[in-house]
Amino acid sequence: MTERTFSIIKPDATRRNLTGAINAVIEAAGLRIVAQRRVKLTEAQAKKFYEVHAERPFYGELVGQMTAEPVVVQVLQGDNAVLKYREVMGATNPENADEGTIRKLFALSIGENSVHGSDSLENAGIEIAQFFTEDEIVG
């Protein structure tokens, strides 16, 4: 089933000019990038996006990291896009990620793990709508 999912290429990766390399891994996995934009998140945007983690001890650091430098927000499309992208990203901790995954290839640490991907189809819709209108998605 064709789905859409949301991706963020995080500051640790954009700082190292890895957007193209990460996009190549995404596309090699059969996912299409149907919307993409480089943005600098405001504190309010980052807090809203990560509000599910608001009570966690790493929340403040996460918001700080995500607003420090630009990110690349994306909409990815393909068969079973949510699950496929989660597989392509690899485990949150790059030490546990499978070879060839984005996090194994590019992440610096569990905190600087290069990418975010939606964890469900429902959340993908919510996350996409925070950054893109339907007219901006060309698929």
Swiss-Prot record:
The enzyme's E.C. designation: 2.7.4.6
Top-level division of the source organism's lineage: Bacteria
Keywords recorded for this protein, A-Z: ATP-binding, Cytoplasm, Kinase, Magnesium, Metal-binding, Nucleotide metabolism, Nucleotide-binding, Phosphoprotein, Transferase
Catalytic activity: a 2'-deoxyribonucleoside 5'-diphosphate + ATP = a 2'-deoxyribonucleoside 5'-triphosphate + ADP; a ribonucleoside 5'-diphosphate + ATP = a ribonucleoside 5'-triphosphate + ADP
Active-site residues (renumbered): 116 (pros-phosphohistidine intermediate)
Single GO term (MF): ATP binding
Classification via Gene3D superfamilies: Nucleoside diphosphate kinase-like domain
Entry-linked SMART domains: NDK
UniProt-listed GO biological process terms: CTP biosynthetic process; GTP biosynthetic process; UTP biosynthetic process
InterPro entries the record matches: NDK-like_dom, NDK-like_dom_sf, Nucleoside_diP_kinase, Nucleoside_diP_kinase_AS
Subcellular localization, as worded in the UniProt entry: Cytoplasm
Essential cofactor(s): Mg(2+)
Residues reported to bind ATP: 10, 58, 86, 92, 103, 113
GO CC annotations, alphabetized: cytoplasm
PROSITE patterns listed in its UniProt record: NDPK (PS00469), NDPK_LIKE (PS51374)
Top-level enzyme category: transferase
Family annotation (HAMAP family): NDP_kinase
Binding partners and assembly: Homotetramer.
Function, as annotated: Major role in the synthesis of nucleoside triphosphates other than ATP. The ATP gamma phosphate is transferred to the NDP beta phosphate via a ping-pong mechanism, using a phosphorylated active-site intermediate.
Family affiliation: Belongs to the NDK family.
The protein's name: Nucleoside diphosphate kinase
Protein encoded by which gene: ndk
